[in-house]
Design a protein with these regions (language model features):
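Short His-centered aromatic/hydrophobic patch
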Residues: 98-105, 120
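Conserved acidic donor-binding segment of nucleotide-sugar-dependent glycosyltransferases
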Residues: 312-323, 330-336
Length: 365
């Protein structure tokens, strides 16, 4: 403990809104703190939707102050200089800086900080639509993503990264941390009020209302199912109005329940009969692993990365295969125990944190 007590680690994220990458940063930061490091969370947007631990040190460097500069490279160049200056003055020299998500990657491309690694949370070919971009823009991304080592949150994400950018930089796969003990404590909180139809059980999906998550596939598959249990959707996002319209069009108003975003979704998850993930693509599928931490049976679409590294083949269906997903939903409602999967302790935060430090050459003994 004393060996690393004065050593500093920085995790960079755009905001602390209620998403998986943001939760990842807080969980990993807490693990580094438990190992004796001084942990700094640097964000560019003031939004906070997660509960913040007092063990971590939080910094806000507002990106909005630079929006009056020309969009793109110039804006990111000058903002990167401001970030460098802030870190040097207010934090000092970290032993590692882990930079999450695309905007932050673009900013740090112009940074002069040392000991930086990108964390790649999604298949960039899908997230950035690389196949549709002109050569000049592709070249720009090539320069960004070959500047620093890259830590990918699943094997599928690493394969996609290497396929897109080659191997001029060091890469590895390290799964996301899942704080099983804390999740189980949080799951003991009072379950939010749900309609009476959920008393005999319900299926649940937790995720942002955006195209990646495939709500249209889930709703159609559920509409085609026996509907013996209601479906609870936890989340918010820019597709909420469209999802609500789909629910009406499929005549599911009495069967599908929208709870909105939940800062603590774990009581809802714990009491569910089963969890369903319907994504077109994922990085790691954090909530899938969280459902296993609570002993909740789970099924998922077999998106190119993430789910197949968490669930066995019998729990998976092809992406956008509505009949196959309907069949799995029916089985999940009638025989949920068929889809029980043990939690993988490789996901525990201290195990993950040690891998991060080893990758960066930081002594964590």
């Amino acid at each position: 403990m004393a060996l690393v007590q004065s050593q500093k680690i920085v995790l960079v994220i755009n905001s602390l809104q209620g998403g998986g990458a943001e939760k990842f940063v807080l969980t990993l930061g807490e693990a580094f703190h438990q190992m004796g490091f001084e942990v700094h969370i640097v964000r560019f947007d003031p939004i906070v939707e997660h509960t913040l631990s007092e063990n971590l040190i939080y910094h806000l460097i507002p990106f909005r102050n630079y929006r009056r500069l020309p969009k793109g490279k110039i804006r990111h160049f000058f903002f990167a200089r401001a970030v460098d200056g802030y870190i040097n003055k207010h934090i000092g020299q970290p032993v590692a800086i882990f930079v999450n998500l695309y905007r932050e990657h673009e900013v740090f491309y112009y940074s002069r900080q040392k000991k930086v690694a990108y964390v790649i949370h999604n298949q960039l070919s899908e997230k950035l639509k690389l196949a549709t971009l002109p050569p000049k823009q592709l070249s720009y991304f090539q320069r960004i993503y070959t500047k620093y080592p890259a830590i990918c949150v699943s094997g599928g994400v690493e394969q996609d990264f290497v396929r897109q950018f080659g191997e001029p930089t060091k890469t590895t796969t390290i799964y996301n941390p899942i704080d099983r003990d804390n999740i189980r404590v949080l799951a003991e909180a009072a379950n939010p009020d749900l309609p009476a139809i959920t008393r005999q059980g319900y299926l649940i999906h937790v995720g942002s209302f955006k195209a990646q998550k495939g709500h249209e596939i889930l709703l159609q598959a559920y509409a085609n199912s026996a509907q013996t249990l209601p479906l609870v959707l936890v989340g918010k996002g820019n597709l909420q109005a469209q999802i609500e319209q789909n629910i009406i069009a499929l005549n599911l108003q009495d069967k599908v329940i929208l709870t909105g975003f939940q800062k603590n979704p774990y009581p809802l998850l714990k009491h569910a009969t089963g969890f369903v993930l319907s994504s077109h693509f994922e990085g790691f599928a954090l909530v899938l692993a969280e459902s296993l931490a609570l002993g909740v049976p789970a099924i998922s679409t077999d998106s190119p990365s993430g789910p197949s590294e968490i669930l066995p083949p019998q729990n998976l269906v092809a992406v956008a295969d509505i009949p196959a997903l309907t069949e799995k939903i029916n089985l999940l409602m009638s025989h949920p125990s068929q889809f029980n999967v043990p939690f993988n302790e490789a996901f525990l935060p201290l195990n993950v944190a040690r891998q991060y430090l080893t990758f960066m050459g930081v002594d964590c003994e």
